[in-house]
From Swiss-Prot:
Record-listed Phosphothreonine modification sites: T63
GO biological process: cellular response to unfolded protein; positive regulation of aggrephagy
GO cellular component, one term: protein folding chaperone complex
Biological role: Involved in the chaperone-assisted selective autophagy (CASA), a crucial process for protein quality control, particularly in mechanical strained cells and tissues such as muscle. Displays temperature-dependent chaperone activity.
Subcellular location: Cytoplasm; Nucleus
UniProt name for this protein: Heat shock protein beta-8
Residue list for modification Phosphoserine: S24, S57, S87
Biased composition (Polar residues): 178-196
One GO molecular-function entry: protein homodimerization activity
Keyword ATP-binding: no
sHSP domain segment(s): 74-185
Gene this chain is encoded by: HSPB8
Length: 196
């Protein structure tokens, strides 16, 4: 998939199913991507009880956050989420994984591609006649790949809830030929060697 395009969806039957809510770093990022769309229409919030409005309009300090959280650097560091446009660093041995909320787009309206060390996710709705006007939604999100990830191994899947899960295994570290962690020198005359 490096420097090429692959129409969505892409499925790998040999891949086991994963639970995106299992990993705590992942669950803190699930609702980060709102693409500038309000999570609730203005007329809907007018009928909410007084006790619910502060919870909907302020930053929630829980694991999952609403789409109304300010996107400042303090919010990012407080929740352990990397700066905007950067992908989270993978843990050693864990696959690199990012979720993008695309619930308002159909699978055929999404495109996932890799180019120049980035994964680019884009979506576009066809124009629709709605409320006396024409409505069209589109977005593009670029996510930088970590150095430990090979762009050819990136794959994406769409959950029933509308989360686009982008994953790639880490490239195992390698050592140049002749370098290794064990000592490959022969013992000198003064050294004792035990063979078993």
């Amino acid at each position: 998939m490096a420097d090429g395009q692959m129409p969505f969806p892409c499925h790998y039957t040999s891949r086991r199913r994963r639970d995106p809510f299992r990993d705590s770093p992942l669950s803190s990022r699930l609702l980060d991507d709102g693409f500038g769309m309000d999570p609730f229409p203005d007329d809907l919030t007018a009928s909410w009880p007084d006790w619910a409005l502060p919870r909907l309009s302020s930053a929630w300090p829980g694991t999952l956050r609403s789409g109304m959280v300010p996107r400042g650097p303090t919010a990012m560091t407080r929740f352990g989420v990397p700066a905007e446009g950067r992908s989270p660093p993978p843990f050693p041995g864990e696959p690199w994984k990012v979720c993008v909320n695309v619930h308002s787009f159909k699978p055929e309206e999404l495109m996932v591609k890799t180019k120049d060390g980035y994964v680019e996710v884009s979506g576009k709705h066809e124009e629709k006649q709605q409320e006396g006007g024409i409505v069209s939604k589109n977005f593009t999100k670029k996510i930088q790949l970590p150095a430990e990830v090979d762009p050819v191994t990136v794959f994406a899947s769409l959950s029933p809830e509308g989360l686009l899960i982008i994953e790639a295994p880490q490239v195992p570290p390698y050592s140049p030929f002749g370098e290794s962690s064990f000592n490959n020198e022969l013992p000198q005359d003064g050294q004792e060697v035990t063979c078993t």
